[in-house]
């Protein structure tokens, strides 16, 4: 095992470096190694969830919209803003009206509950 690590064989380089440091009596994990790991994790998180980037502040976007549609009369502007606000919620509302939560037969913790089985359609 030690020989494999010393030669830098199948095990990754990070591991061998930490093992060598341990042998020489230094700290197991240097700050550089920790930083590298953290940055790598951050990169992975960014790649996995690109949609979690912080959105522009709603007030700012509203002001921008106002600036763009300044010449038009106010009622039209209000109508447009209402449409913009409502659009994202429409799908969610319609599915809620049918009694479908987006957890799909699961409770708030995401655990599944015992779903009833109706033999001949819903009563």
From Swiss-Prot:
Region (Disordered): 1-38, 100-123
Taxonomic superkingdom: Viruses
Biased composition (Basic and acidic residues): 26-38
Compositional bias segments (type: Polar residues): 13-25, 106-115
Protein name, as recorded: Putative trans-acting factor
């Amino acid at each position: 095992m030690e020989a494999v690590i010393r030669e830098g064989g199948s095990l990754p380089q990070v591991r061998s470096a930490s093992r060598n440091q341990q042998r020489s009596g230094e700290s197991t994990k240097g700050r550089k190694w920790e930083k590298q790991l953290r940055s790598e994790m951050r990169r992975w998180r960014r790649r996995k969830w690109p949609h979690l980037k912080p959105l522009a502040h709603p007030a700012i976007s509203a002001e921008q919209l106002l600036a763009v549609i300044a010449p038009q009369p106010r009622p039209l502007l209000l109508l447009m803003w209402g449409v913009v606000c409502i659009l994202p919620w429409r799908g969610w509302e319609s599915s809620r009206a049918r009694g479908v939560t987006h957890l799909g037969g699961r409770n708030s913790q995401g655990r599944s509950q015992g779903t009833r089985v109706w033999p001949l359609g819903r009563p």
